[in-house]
Amino acid sequence: MKRAFIMVLDSFGIGATEDAERFGDAGSDTLGHIAEACAKGEADIGRKGPLHLPNLTKLGLAKAHEGATGFIPAGMDGNAEITGAYAWAHELSSGKDTPSGHWEIAGVPVLFDWGYFTDEKNSFPQELLDKLVERANLPGYLGNCHSSGTVILDELGEEHMKTGKPIFYTSADSVFQIACHEETFGLDRLYELCEIAREELTEGGYNIGRVIARPFVGDKAGNFQRTGNRHDLAVEPPSPVVLKKLVDEKGGHVVSVGKIADIYANMGITKKVKATGLDALFDATIKEMKEAGDNTIVFTNFVDFDSSWGHRRDVAGYAAGLELFDRRLPELLELVGEDDIIIFTADHGCDPTWKGTDHTREHIPVLVYGPKVKPGSLGHRDTFADIGQTVAKYFGLSDMEYGKALF
């Protein structure tokens, strides 16, 4: 029985890539800078001391970081026994966004340029805004700018509740984000508005990767909170990802846990499981791994590293999340059967010590474990697509166009 489990620690980069300067990210290092802050006692909120990741270290995390940067992260054991195969991978795609990283992991790099809304204020074309107001029968809109999602709620949340005007905003990513109150505006109405926005952006040729529904609750600035009912409306990958090949060529199954299905616009997904928060995502993943049959991929995105701690530049929170993940990791490994493989990786960086609030262009770790996987270094990889090619080879599928199998 063959099964593959893919675990994406969203934004867990391990050091700037050679082309990071082009993105303003030269010197960024999500893991390295978190470890450095922990070792200096600068991340002792809710946790304490050096970054403690013994299980990920045994799989080769510290060694992968050394391969990418030339050094072992501060406080981590560079001499630990290695039980997994490890590599560090460079992104071939043109961006440093979630769809690009995930599509490339599944064998389809993004070799075109996404569209972006680059103006910090008055970010969106008036023609687009007018169409949204007309089609969705809106009283107007708020925002129309670049912002962090939590900051804009404090700035505009109360006005949104009073006026019923949705909050439109974007970032350095190829996104159109809409924040609305779940109760006063309505969750279904927000989803309908996002569908309209997706249609207008596609028909208008804006080439925007995602429309993101950002529902929130609360009654005043300071206590607004985003809920777990986020929904991403992505465009489809330009060619079949390895997930779809497994379904089409082997009649296989692909289980999405978390936001995976949204990222791939449901391409190749046969079952969707929603969960919010690290522990809930872990619990859902464990349940699906236990139930998975032959020719199945269980694919989980652990979004909190990115959304809760990376973008918010919360070093201590990110460190605590990593340590929680590491403590629970053995629960996943014990479910890996004789012919199974489990892969731990990331889709980009989001260094919580870096300027601004955006992603960082970094190498990602590729940590592979399985009873038949030979431990040791798999070296530098030129593309994340090596993961997709490995999965294709493992299941006996036709070759992906990009990538070389890890083994």
Curated annotation (Swiss-Prot):
GO terms, molecular function: magnesium ion binding; manganese ion binding; phosphopentomutase activity
Catalyzed reactions: 2-deoxy-alpha-D-ribose 1-phosphate = 2-deoxy-D-ribose 5-phosphate; alpha-D-ribose 1-phosphate = D-ribose 5-phosphate
Gene3D superfamilies named among the record's database cross-references: Alkaline Phosphatase, subunit A, Phosphopentomutase
Cofactor notes: Binds 2 manganese ions.
Name the record gives this protein: Phosphopentomutase
Role description: Isomerase that catalyzes the conversion of deoxy-ribose 1-phosphate (dRib-1-P) and ribose 1-phosphate (Rib-1-P) to deoxy-ribose 5-phosphate (dRib-5-P) and ribose 5-phosphate (Rib-5-P), respectively.
Cofactor: Mn(2+)
Segments passing through the bilayer: none
Any one Gene Ontology cellular component term annotated for this protein: cytosol
Subcellular location: Cytoplasm
Matching PANTHER family: PHOSPHOPENTOMUTASE (PTHR21110:SF0)
Binding, Mn(2+) 2: D306, H311, H359
Keywords for the protein's UniProt record, in alphabetical order: Cytoplasm, Isomerase, Manganese, Metal-binding
Protein species of origin: Cronobacter sakazakii (strain ATCC BAA-894) (Enterobacter sakazakii)
Pathway field: Carbohydrate degradation; 2-deoxy-D-ribose 1-phosphate degradation; D-glyceraldehyde 3-phosphate and acetaldehyde from 2-deoxy-alpha-D-ribose 1-phosphate: step 1/2
Enzyme Commission numbers on file: 5.4.2.7
Gene Ontology process terms (BP): 2-deoxyribose 1-phosphate catabolic process; 5-phosphoribose 1-diphosphate biosynthetic process; metabolic compound salvage; nucleotide metabolic process
HAMAP family: Phosphopentomut (MF_00740)
Binding residues annotated for Mn(2+) 1, in chain numbering: D10, D347, H348
Protein family according to the UniProt entry: Belongs to the phosphopentomutase family.
